[in-house]
A protein has these predicted regions:
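Conserved serine/cysteine hydrolase catalytic core
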Residues: 1-69, 74-76
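Catalytic active-site module of serine/aspartate enzymes centered on a nucleophile-bearing elbow/loop
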Residues: 72-101
Length: 101
């Protein structure tokens, strides 16, 4: 999986698509999220997973953030970096299996 990621990271079209994705996240997506905030919530269960070796839980409360957007939020820290499924496939699988059971 890592080699596939690297191959895509070398493709100019893929790099452009990644940049457009992040550009939308801080512009159009952000504006739409702000307009939607407080008007409704996601009503199905939401699972939040994050890597223990990353910065997400150091900077944010991953579950707490999603409670503004969803009624039923569950979360689990996985012993991995940013790429949970690639770095820690079994714990990621177990967390998802438990959630979808």
């Amino acid at each position: 999986a890592y080699e596939d990621f690297l191959q895509n990271a070398r493709d100019p079209a893929a790099i452009h698509a990644m940049c457009e994705y992040y550009r939308a996240a801080v512009s159009v997506d952000f504006q739409q999220d702000q307009a939607d905030r407080g008007t409704r919530k996601i009503e199905c269960p939401v699972m939040v997973l994050w890597g223990a070796k990353g910065v997400i839980s150091k900077w944010y409360d991953p579950v707490g953030i999603w409670k503004d957007w969803a009624s039923d939020v569950r979360g689990e820290e996985i012993d991995s970096g940013h790429m949970l499924a690639e770095e820690a496939p079994e714990p990621t699988y177990q967390a998802l299996r438990k959630f979808f059971a």
